[in-house]
From Swiss-Prot:
Keywords associated with the record: Bacteriochlorophyll, Chlorophyll, Chromophore, Electron transport, Magnesium, Metal-binding, Photosynthesis, Reaction center, Transport
Residues noted as binding bacteriochlorophyll a 3 in the record, renumbered to the chain: H298
Protein name: Bacteriochlorophyll a protein
Binding site for bacteriochlorophyll a 7: H297
UniProt KW NAD keyword: no
Organism: Prosthecochloris aestuarii
Gene3D superfamilies: Bacteriochlorophyll A
Residues involved in bacteriochlorophyll a 1 binding: H110
Subunit structure: Homotrimer. Each subunit contains 7 molecules of bacteriochlorophyll a.
A single GO BP: photosynthesis
List of residues binding bacteriochlorophyll a 4: H290
Amino acid sequence: ALFGTKDTTTAHSDYEIILEGGSSSWGQVKGRAKVNVPAAIPLLPTDCNIRIDAKPLDAQKGVVRFTTKIESVVDSVKNTLNVEVDIANETKDRRIAVGEGSLSVGDFSHSFSFEGQVVNMYYYRSDAVRRNIPNPIYMQGRQFHDILMKVPLDNNDLVDTWEGFQQSISGGGANFGDWIREFWFIGPAFAAINEGGQRISPIVVNSSNVEGGEKGPVGVTRWKFSHAGSGVVDSISRWTELFPVEQLNKPASIEGGFRSDSQGIEVKVDGNLPGVSRDAGGGLRRILNHPLIPLVHHGMVGKFNDFTVDTQLKIVLPKGYKIRYAAPQFRSQNLEEYRWSGGAYARWVEHVCKGGTGQFEVLYAQ
């Protein structure tokens, strides 16, 4: 949703995590979200389905076969991408990948194959992910989300707001904290709008690059708005944490769908994943930081005062297990089923959506 609208943007989302028993790190993750976007009606309705399968081929050498299938229909044109790739860790810092695939757009099709190596495997992880990882490795430093958007200049108030925002960045950021509190910058908005078939003119902002100081906005002291892809990488990094190769002792999968039309955006995700929980010591296990699957990382921009979030989370523990510590605190419990909604949880969700990296800590044991 683009700022400047008089209508309220509402994001509804429901998440469910079902954990396996014992010392297993596996779990099922389900997410559903629906966002009405009255200010950004797509001209081209989009329907996209994604499936990713990961299968271990040689556990000792860390060889994994990834199979990806993506199908989308944009303005009645069907597009497909199929890729199968075998990935192996040659050394601690070196990975090799060999694969093949095919791409089709309408009547056009193309097959391809590839072989590549990655040396010094640096990749970005958000602060939220970092808290679950003892020694994170970053790609391109400490990035935060992009500001990439198209803005319709509908009225003088919006023009003044936009010019003020640009000045606050180009002027060295003296007033940047005030602007960042007023608007929600969530994910690579330009990419989401552009790929969703939404063409909004007459102004296009391709990138902004600003770094925060010691006292950053909304409690975030280390942040950076950077060109091209940090929001996407953040989202991917959260999901890849759920795919630790050393735990991939059976096939894992993610299946998702994305729909956009004049009524808004719908996202659904179902996964069977090997990295949903981690050993926290002392007989405790930690559930990985709440993925917030579609809400935080898939390109929404909404005016702060007109953006509401309605999020629920359900976690189902193995039989005989109990939550020993939870922050934010759960709302209700029925045997091994725990639910979060409203209250401290809602405040935490809003904090994350405004760029915060507030604590989400759930520890459970028998």
